[in-house]
Amino acid sequence: MEKLSLKKRLFFRVAEYLIFILIWCIFLTCRVKFTPTKLPEKPCVVVFWHGRLAMMSFAYRRWWLRDFGKRRAKVIISDHKDGEIITRVISHFGIGAIRGSSFKGGARALMGAIKEIKNGTDVIITPDGPRGPLHSVADGAVILAQRLNLDIYALNYEASSFWKFRSWDEMVLPKPFSRINYSLSAPLNLTGLSLDAGKEAIRQLLFASAEKDAKF
């Protein structure tokens, strides 16, 4: 990302804290359920739809920082200005970022992800981000999992009452005092699958998680 002007730095700083405060205020009013889960000892690839980004830091806070014993994970985030705001917000939850995407900086992001995994860090990907189409799966998650022989896990949340933004990703923001179900799926292994078959398997895994979590 290019060097930021003073005006942009101020904008990002204000947006960063407003979003951080907003999601915490919503989260604290909600009834939240985290489905009991576990991850393998070795690193893995975790995927969730871009439209579930708003409240996903709380899944990291609960599982990676608490239940998994301060296990490390980093999220692949685009170099776009929206990605800069996201990077700043999630940093307050102790979440690191690997900058780049399938549209810009993709090769750099992939190499960064491989390096992090070899250092024992899980890599989290929004397969339809940063620009869509909605619920599409880019090549990165499949390539990463197959190259390093890693399992893939679907991370998801659904809310009993929510706002759905008119954005390409149909961002879901739970309403205050709603119920939120978080889940982390069983492992998916893509060994032997073609690129297209692997991408479709990830899609179906995420859809299955959404269907299950929507039962309140």
Positions of PLM-derived features:
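Non-catalytic C-terminal accessory region of glycerolipid acyltransferases
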Residues: M1-I21, C25, K42, R88, ...
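Alpha-helix initiation/capping motif
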Residues: S5, P36, I76-H80, A138-G140
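A short, well-structured juxtamembrane/interface segment
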Residues: I21-P43, R61-R62
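Generic structural signal for residues positioned in beta-strands
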Residues: R31, V45, K74, N181-S183
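Glycine-rich, highly charged phosphate/nucleotide-binding loops
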Residues: R31-K33, G105-A109
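Conserved beta-strand termini and adjacent loop/short-helix elements that scaffold enzyme active sites
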Residues: T35-T37, S78, G100-F103, S185-P187
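Residues that cap or initiate secondary-structure elements
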Residues: K38, R52, K81, R131, ...
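Catalytic core of membrane glycerolipid acyltransferases/transacylases, capturing the structured
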Residues: K42-F103, L148
